[in-house]
Amino acid sequence: MSLTLRVLAPDQSVFDGTAEEVILPSTTGLIGILPGHISLVTALDIGVMRVRTNGAWNSIALMGGFAEVEADDVTVLVNGAELGDSIDATTAEAELEQAKAKVSQMEGQEPSTEKIKAQQTFNRARARVQATK
């Protein structure tokens, strides 16, 4: 038995195929999906989705969105996504270091739009790095 998985971003279809198992980064923690899973709709956080196909794990960096599970069909609608294999690890690491420095620089400051954007940039950069591993 397998799952039918579709990962859709506004500008592209990132994944459309079958999977043996999916691990989603929900806003309340990681959720594992296997064939026969109960119906579910959940919000997704910025993070890494893991997909097992043919016994091998693949990673997809997600930039937040929603997932629906219905009768072995998993549909993931996200703000943005990148296959881990397509991310340049060196560039992603450099972007993570820049984002980390920006967040550290703003530590102790009052909450602001700029501080929230810096934290989101850091979260996206971290997800991209994690997806390369």
Swiss-Prot record:
Protein purpose: Produces ATP from ADP in the presence of a proton gradient across the membrane.
What compartments host this protein? Cellular thylakoid membrane
| NCBIfam families for this protein | ATP_synt_epsi
Instruction: Identify the species of origin.
Output: Prochlorococcus marinus (strain MIT 9303)
Question: Which keywords are on file for this protein?
Answer: ATP synthesis, CF(1), Hydrogen ion transport, Ion transport, Membrane, Thylakoid, Transport
What is the membrane topology noted in the UniProt record heading this document? Peripheral membrane protein
Know the name of this protein?
ATP synthase epsilon chain
Q: Which HAMAP family match?
A: ATP_synth_epsil_bac
**CDD domains tied to this protein:** F1-ATPase_delta
Q: List the InterPro entries hit by this protein, alphabetically.
A: ATP_synth_F1_dsu/esu, ATP_synth_F1_dsu/esu_N, ATP_synth_F1_esu_C, ATPsynth_dsu/esu_N
Q: Which domain of life is it from?
A: Bacteria
**Which Gene3D superfamilies does the entry link to?**
F0F1 ATP synthase delta/epsilon subunit, N-terminal, Helix hairpin bin
| Single annotated GO MF | ATP binding
A GO-annotated cellular component: proton-transporting ATP synthase complex
Q: Which family does it belong to?
A: Belongs to the ATPase epsilon chain family.
- Does this UniProt record's set of keywords contain Protease? no
Share what the entry says about its subunit structure, partners included.
F-type ATPases have 2 components, CF(1) - the catalytic core - and CF(0) - the membrane proton channel. CF(1) has five subunits: alpha(3), beta(3), gamma(1), delta(1), epsilon(1). CF(0) has three main subunits: a, b and c.
SUPFAM superfamilies per the record?
A: Epsilon subunit of F1F0-ATP synthase N-terminal domain
